[in-house]
Amino acid sequence: MQRLGPFSTLYGRVLAPLPGRAGGAASGGGGNSWGVLGSHVQPPGRAQFGVGSTSTSSGDANSVCPAPSTMSKAEEAKKLAGRAAVENHVRNNQVLGIGSGSTIVHAVQRIAERVKQENLNLICIPTSFQARQLILQHGLTLSDLDRHPEIDLAIDGADEVDADLNLIKGGGGCLTQEKIVAGNASRFIVIADFRKDSKNLGDQWHKGIPIEVIPMAYVPVSRTVTQKFGGVIELRMAVNKAGPVVTDNGNFILDWKFDRVHKWSEVNTAITMIPGVVDTGLFINMAERVYFGMQDGSVNMREKPF
């Protein structure tokens, strides 16, 4: 792991993340539990894996809220990671994939600053409604995969990163479009704060692996996943509307709270082959490099092992 020194620049004010689209597309939450005989079923909101972790990351509904100082350090760490990635990888005349979530806000702000300062010619491809609005609000050039199917660089956040740079993504409900953009990029760079760095998936992130499904298939998909791999499935429910979260693609999100370490490449392939599954929040062997903003103001960089 390479440690980058702290930035000395005094950063300006950062825009807060945009709310999810109407209907709760980016909202998280609990939901209906679909356990089956022989599966390991626990109440919604309870950590399914990594019990005993002292992480302050969100995920366990019964955990004590972290102190404000911890949260401010996490937000500053996101800013550090986002700016480091932009400084090291964004160049003139690139087509950029812009991720979704709270961390990407800081990267987009720095991209906009560099465009103004250096007169960069950049084209931005969004991964969600939120990303599209960020691009427009910061005066960047918006495009899509129809016009620019080849992306030079994609930058996005993650809910958790393991030792092999496998990711869990989709806490904000944008996993399918995020995976499409990352998969069409020559380079995929991830930015995150110190809370997202884990040895194994599930050590820090306790909300499970998101699975986007066609609405009519959410019950059979839930049963099939738990029968094959154990754990418990929850249909993600919206916060500001009655009913489930609806993605930007008009689908539902299942959160699979697994109860043990798996061979994630095999699991990802098996789940995506289930009829009704659109995609999963497992990003396997996709990230080239991850920047972690740390509590001490430094940035740790990890590259994909070979």
From Swiss-Prot:
GO terms under cellular component: cytoplasm
Keywords, in A-Z order: Isomerase, Phosphoprotein
An example Gene Ontology molecular-function term: ribose-5-phosphate isomerase activity
Region described as Disordered: 45-68
Biased composition (Polar residues): 51-61
Sites bearing Phosphoserine, chain numbering: S102
Domain of life: Eukaryota
Biological pathway: Carbohydrate degradation; pentose phosphate pathway; D-ribose 5-phosphate from D-ribulose 5-phosphate (non-oxidative stage): step 1/1
Chemical reaction(s) catalysed: aldehydo-D-ribose 5-phosphate = D-ribulose 5-phosphate
Gene3D superfamilies linked: 3.30.70.260, 3.40.50.1360
Keyword Cell cycle annotated: no
SUPFAM superfamilies associated with the record: D-ribose-5-phosphate isomerase (RpiA), lid domain, NagB/RpiA/CoA transferase-like
Family of this protein: Belongs to the ribose 5-phosphate isomerase family.
Protein name, per record: Ribose-5-phosphate isomerase
Upper classification of the organism: Eukaryota, Metazoa, Chordata, Craniata, Vertebrata
